[in-house]
Amino acid sequence: MINDQGRRRIRARQPEIDRRLRSPRPDGRRGLTLLGRLPAHVSRNIEFTLQQLAAVAPEQYYYSSPDLHITVMDLLAARDDLRLSAKQLARYRAAVGKIVATIPPIHWRLQGMIVSPGAVLVTGDYGPELAELRRRLRSELPALHLPVAERYPTVSGHVTVARFTHPISAPDRFLAAIKENATTNYGHFTMHALDLVVHDWYNRQVESCVRLPFVGDGR
């Protein structure tokens, strides 16, 4: 289980270090991602927990509220050499938007916090619409000669809230804070639209963004 693996690595002071976050150079990788934004009350609740973690391990990287998101699918995983023409991007927008427009809004409950070997995650429960959306994207986009190149097939729904940039100096205290929030309820919400973005690995630099509504949403 990912949480057990993460806890073992942290106890051994051997987390997976994200060295790009330690570089003064901006992240040059770009990817095409379909993601969901968090409502303000959920982001605020997560930030309260991140303040608690930062008090124990200030040397790590913690996502700011605007950067928090749920990755629905990495259509083209972020890499250094990704280049999309305006025509290619328009084709993805049209095709993905058409699929999203047939899917009902997705209901979410974010509750609990776990660690992977390289990150801290807030876990989510969600409606069956998410799996159906992913299935259709994986089958219908390639049929339209629009490649799908995921880093790995996304099957869960979570929010990455922190990444490790250094060994954790107080692993027991850090893991205690994670355990304290293992059942924390960060909030319920309904996702009425998704964003199709070209962005860097950490969602700090967004170069292109279009909002795609679910079926029946007039927002």
Tell me the role of every PLM-derived stretch.
Residues 1-219:
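Histidine-dependent nucleotide/RNA phosphoesterase domain, centered on the 2H-phosphoesterase fold
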